[in-house]
Amino acid sequence: MAFMGTSSAVHPAILVILDGWGYREQTDGNAVAAAKTPIFDALKASYPFTLIHTSGKAVGLPRGQMGNSEVGHLNLGAGRMVPQELVRISDAVEEGTLLSNPELLRLCRTVRERGGKLHGVGLVSDGGVHSHIEHLFGLLDLAKREGFETLFIHGMSDGRDTPPTSGVAYFEKLEARIAETGFGTIATLGGRYFGMDRDRRWDRTEAMYRVMTETGPGTGKRASETLRESHAAGKTDEFVLPVRLAAGAVEPGDGVIYFNFRPDRARQLTRAFVQADFDGFVRPYLDPLAFLTFTQYDATLPVAVAFAPQSLDNLLGQVIAHHGLRQFRIAETEKYAHVTYFFNGGIETPLPGEERSMIQSPLVPTYDLKPEMAAREVTDHAVAAIETRQYSLIVINYANPDMVGHTGNFDATVKAVETVDACIGRLVEACVRAGGTMLLTADHGNAELMWDEQGNPWTAHTTNPVPFILIESEGLKIPGWGTDVQLRAGGSLGDIAPTILEILGLPQPAEMTGRSLLGESEIEIRTPRSPLRVGL
């Protein structure tokens, strides 16, 4: 389809995603409440506001399961509740169909014929964001049933989607399962900071890769013991240094099963193993190596996939492209995949008329050292994109509340929230000048809960709702002004895409089963009047 020319300015719909900015009435341990947010407060008081659900069944997860950025952006872009891989794989484990998965059986057969070893790689916790320990238990059952002497486990400790020192309990559970069944070997251990980097910090990936591939007897210690020693030395689960515990290196002829189901933090380590032309760091190419991932991490990777991607049609970006309209996506490195790959339903290639901008995240060990991250640079480029007046849809992600919130540093998270608040103000001004409509929301909670009831740091996401504010501009308006409009209550992330389509005057496809948050409101042209000024 031909794209609309830019000779006549468009009135954009601007979706601003405040990653990890949840809503919670209690102020104790609430970095959002503690922060000075004059822009957000003024917008909330003067424009249509509601709370939306971002966790559990509302976004395709099990009841009570906290949301995350992948799930959030997938639901945002799809305009519907999308059943998640966590549920899909858990059902396969529970129902026993994992044991007959054709791709898993094919890999096992190949490795047996070569006389190789079988390895399981992934995050060992029940956080449910990247993996689940029950999936590893299912894999142990499969490997034993397929006649392998053992499954060599290369386990990564969490401490990010779970409490910072909870890894001991997870690895004790794994050790107990191994002792009970007499099957399985924890060969290596390392914090997710190393094995699950997604920001091209190749030195981190290399540290995990080396431990997994270099031969040796290991320390002979239990994983749980090693974690306790790490905690005593001041390193929480996320930052445990990679170490070999027992013999069982990944070697040519072996098979590797990566049991994480979320792609973004599993890609780098996978590439190091399977890409012949890999250049992240110098390493010998292990060939032959049978490699399988639980889900599709990247369609270009030469790996088998146990659970093929589900097809999603008529997503928001596709509808925009189908109508010949232009769109713009922007985020810093840490969240770039979310506004592109995940927002587009797991498709890497840009849509027709879709332009992207990735701003480099600061190169610091942890983001509490620079809570501003790249928010100001993201805002600079976003404002410039708005001012071109050529994009009908602009999607912006601010990573700060989530990424700094994950560090557990309360004061730094407060500063992160305040940084984003100032950036929102600049976006509002640009939106006003462009005559656009801004939809301000979040993908899940995090920064609103920084410690638990016992006063321990809480670094994981939450099940709290998130704010949704509809910010009107001049020209194209929602009927009513300010608090006159009552947005529909009880909505979820899948309802935002239908809301955007209604604002843009585009038909909602049948596959998009979410419901517009505008309720009975209708779009109309109104007499221009000065929009709210928020002290900018």
UniProtKB/Swiss-Prot annotation:
The organism's place on the tree of life at top rank: Bacteria
GO molecular function: manganese ion binding; phosphoglycerate mutase activity
Positions contributing to Mn(2+) 2 binding: D19, S69, D443, H444
Entry-linked InterPro entries: Alkaline_phosphatase_core_sf, BPG-indep_PGM_N, Metalloenzyme, PGAM_B_sf, Pgm_bpd_ind
Gene Ontology BP term (one): glucose catabolic process
Pathway terms, separated by semicolons: Carbohydrate degradation; glycolysis; pyruvate from D-glyceraldehyde 3-phosphate: step 3/5
GO CC annotations, alphabetized: cytosol
Keywords, sorted A to Z: Glycolysis, Isomerase, Manganese, Metal-binding
Residues that hold Mn(2+) 1 according to the record: D402, H406, H461
Residues that hold substrate according to the record: H130, R160, D161, R192, R198, R262, P263, D264, R265, K335
Free-text comment on the cofactor: Binds 2 manganese ions per subunit.
Cofactor(s) this protein cannot do without: Mn(2+)
Location of the active site: S69 (phosphoserine intermediate)
E.C. no: 5.4.2.12
NCBIfam families (alphabetical): pgm_bpd_ind
Family from the record: Belongs to the BPG-independent phosphoglycerate mutase family.
Functional description taken from the UniProt entry: Catalyzes the interconversion of 2-phosphoglycerate and 3-phosphoglycerate.
Subunit architecture: Monomer.
Protein name: 2,3-bisphosphoglycerate-independent phosphoglycerate mutase
Organism: Gloeobacter violaceus (strain ATCC 29082 / PCC 7421)
Name of encoding gene: gpmI
